[in-house]
A protein has these predicted regions:
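Metal-dependent enolase-superfamily TIM-barrel catalytic cores that perform enediolate-based chemistry
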Residues: 116, 120, 124-233
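Metal- or metallocofactor-binding catalytic centers and their adjacent structured scaffolds
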Residues: 24-101, 382-387
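Shared catalytic-loop signature of beta/alpha-barrel
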Residues: 50, 66, 204, 210, ...
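Extended hydrophobic packing segments that form well-structured cores
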Residues: 349-387
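Conserved, mostly hydrophobic/aromatic
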Residues: 3, 28, 52, 89, ...
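Structured beta-strand/loop patches that form or line metal/cofactor-binding pockets in enzymes
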Residues: 1-32, 36-37, 320-327, 380-382
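Glycine-rich, aromatic-flanked loop segments that form ligand/cofactor-binding clefts
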Residues: 90-127
Length: 387
């Protein structure tokens, strides 16, 4: 069995676009993946056809280690764009393998390790501006069954917080904590905004809210700084979504710079490399919680990884807070119920692209909203129905 055809599909999802891909074998089996890289989807699509396609056509889909390892070796300059294209292909290969073996992908990755897959909500704060708004949105999310919520309370801060910015952030966190009570987990997103000193000071002020973790308190590529911040604070630290290579994750884990590793399966090489990262983390008693802020095919890959990974902790969930047509982009897929994920027992990933719905939402060029000016907060806190 060889890969005979390579296709890509761009579709809009409000503020961003999703890039799906499909591989077809000479025996007629198909596999789908996702290569969405926020606000760079057309660039990734070009890489898919001008660089990846020639390296995947004619290859045996079962030869994942050789095929994907060879592409990672051959990329030379590296980076998120090309690794996203490679990652999407890797997931599509697993989809083909699962269908060929008549097994869901998670069973090929080690089998079931968990009875259920807890989710934490992200994007739940649509339309919120004030502490009262955040309180109301938080209660709505908990009413859907979520037992953990993530949000960035820091506005447009960069490196340091003024006293006013610090107080405003703490007021937002306090409002959400009061609204949901002590039994709901809060993940505080920093987006790598702060200097090490300001991050430590801010995390100490957050201790009274007992967050599950503080995410990217400093720039995540500065792994030494992450480790230093972790040593000086009592709160758990999470990071990893903006790391891409096995060497990056080895350093992150060996320095014990985090308590939770957040690899993004869509950007770090796919499922097999993510399993290797999780195994390294397990040796250090570090848990994993995959980042996933893109579409339904990427989420499906995460869930197969989660179910088969012993040190999995909790899965990020935008699914119920995305555009209304999100789940219609694929067939056979509605994976969340009352704040937890579940997987169908279908072969492969368990879903297929719906080309009709995809074509109804064509690509729209959007500009990346900088996290350090007012546009990002305005855009990301719009209600999805307004997009």
């Amino acid at each position: 069995m060889k890969i005979a055809r390579f296709e890509t599909f761009l579709t809009n999802s409000g503020l961003r676009n999703y890039l799906f891909l499909r591989l077809t074998t000479d025996s007629g089996l198909t596999g789908i993946g996702e290569a969405s890289l926020e606000w760079q989807e057309k660039t990734v699509e070009t890489v898919c056809h001008e660089w990846v396609e020639d390296r995947i056509l004619g290859r045996d889909p079962f030869d994942i280690e050789a095929v994907i390892g060879g592409m990672i070796r051959d990329q030379y300059q590296g980076g998120s764009t090309i690794l996203t294209a490679i990652s999407g292909v890797e997931v599509a290969l697993w989809d083909i393998i699962g269908k060929a073996c008549q097994q869901p992908v998670y069973k090929l990755l080690g089998g079931r390790c968990h009875t259920h897959l807890p989710a934490y909500a992200n994007g739940w704060y649509g339309g919120a501006r004030t502490p009262q708004d955040f309180s109301e949105r938080a209660r709505e999310a908990v009413g859907r069954g979520y037992r953990a919520l993530k949000f960035d309370p820091f506005g447009t801060a960069w490196k340091n917080l003024t006293p006013e910015e610090s107080e405003a952030a703490l007021e937002l966190v306090a409002a959400v904590r009061e609204a949901v009570g002590p039994g709901v987990g809060l993940m505080i997103e920093f987006h790598g905004r702060l200097s090490a000193g300001c991050a430590v000071e801010t995390m100490r002020k957050l201790e009274r809210f007992h967050p599950v973790w503080c995410e990217e308190p400093v720039a995540p590529e500065c792994i030494d700084l992450l480790a230093e911040v972790k040593k000086q604070t009592t709160l758990p630290v999470a990071a990893g979504e903006r790391l891409y290579t096995l060497a990056d994750f080895y350093r992150l884990i060996s320095l014990r710079a985090v308590d939770v590793v957040q690899m993004d399966i869509s950007h770090c090489g796919g499922l097999w490399l993510s399993k290797k990262i999780a195994a390294m983390a397990a040796v250090q008693d570090i848990r994993v919680s995959p980042h996933c802020s893109v579409g339904p095919v990427a989420l499906a890959a995460c869930l197969h990884f989660d179910l088969s990974t012993p040190n999995f902790m909790v899965q990020e969930a935008f699914a119920e807070f995305d555009v209304p047509w999100r789940n219609s982009l694929v067939r056979g897929w509605n994976p969340i119920r009352e704040g937890a994920f579940f997987l169908p027992e279908a072969p492969g990933l368990g879903l297929e692209l719906d080309e009709r719905v995809i074509s109804e939402h064509p690509y729209i060029r959007n500009t990346f909203p900088s996290l350090w000016d007012g546009d990002w907060f305005e855009n990301f806190t719009r209600k999805k129905g307004d997009q």
